[in-house]
Amino acid sequence: MTDFVAYKGSQKHLAYAASKAALENLTLSFAAQYAPLVKVNSIAPSLIMFNENDSAEYQQKALQKSVMQKIGGYEEMIKAVEYLFSSQYITGETIKITGGRHLK
């Protein structure tokens, strides 16, 4: 699993952003190396609410950054992974789960 920060960088979390960008490249490299025997894909979520106990500050931050005006949950990640598993043709791809954050 990568992270949306792999595409935009982070002034506060340089090492984290760099490591997620490296995972993005690793997804591409492994997909090229091991095709057609193995499909290699990843997901890159942005702000996701994992439970209702996430702080109000976290929830407000997520809402402000989403053009969908809602907070994604772990269910969105599960659906993306299921989609990637169900495809016989997709490899070397990353699905961004951002609620449109990349559009702002």
Regions found by a protein language model. Give the residues of each.
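C-terminal substrate-recognition "lid" of short-chain dehydrogenase/reductases
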Residues: 73-97, 102
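Alpha-helical segment proximal to the catalytic Tyr-Lys
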Residues: 31-36
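Active-site helix of classical SDR
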Residues: 19
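Residue(s) in the substrate-gating loop at a strand-loop-helix junction
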Residues: 3
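Active-site loop immediately N-terminal to the catalytic Tyr-X3-Lys motif
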Residues: 8-14, 69
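Catalytic Tyr-x(3-8)-Lys segment
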Residues: 57-76
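Catalytic tyrosine of NAD(P)H-dependent dehydrogenase/reductases that use a Tyr as the general acid/base
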Residues: 16, 24
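Conserved SDR Rossmann-fold cofactor-binding beta-strand/turn motif
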Residues: 39-49, 85, 96-98
